[in-house]
């Protein structure tokens, strides 16, 4: 499961962006992943603070952005995949928000086909 999360996050351009630590995908190894898994298993895992940065928007305002460490991103992805595997089958077929392969466009298509 961790290898699947690693593979998914590795493809993302943001994988090389450090959070509060200088940790990026380059520093990840099987040994490091095993340490993270052991910390979670024995309830010693601690989330690290998120690095906050402000990105300028076109209208001149700033957009706040939180950048977690790479280890935190990986643990979040594992949790997301576990929760998704459990809850996705229980969702209504007519529900489109925040679901894999669904969104506002699929909702509009369904409305157009039904009505």
Put a short name on every predicted segment.
Residues 1-115:
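Conserved pre-catalytic core of RNA-dependent polymerases
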């Amino acid at each position: 499961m961790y290898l699947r999360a690693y593979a998914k996050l590795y493809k993302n351009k943001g994988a090389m962006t450090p959070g509060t630590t200088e940790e990026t995908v380059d520093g990840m190894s099987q040994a490091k992943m095993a340490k993270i898994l052991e910390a979670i298993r024995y309830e010693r895992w601690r989330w690290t603070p998120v690095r906050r940065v402000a990105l300028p928007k076109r209208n001149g305002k700033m957009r706040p952005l939180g950048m977690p460490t790479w280890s935190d991103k990986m643990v979040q992805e594992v949790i997301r995949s576990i929760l998704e595997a459990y809850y996705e089958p229980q969702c209504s077929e007519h529900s489109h928000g925040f679901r894999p392969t669904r969104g506002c466009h699929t909702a509009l298509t369904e409305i157009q086909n039904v009505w």
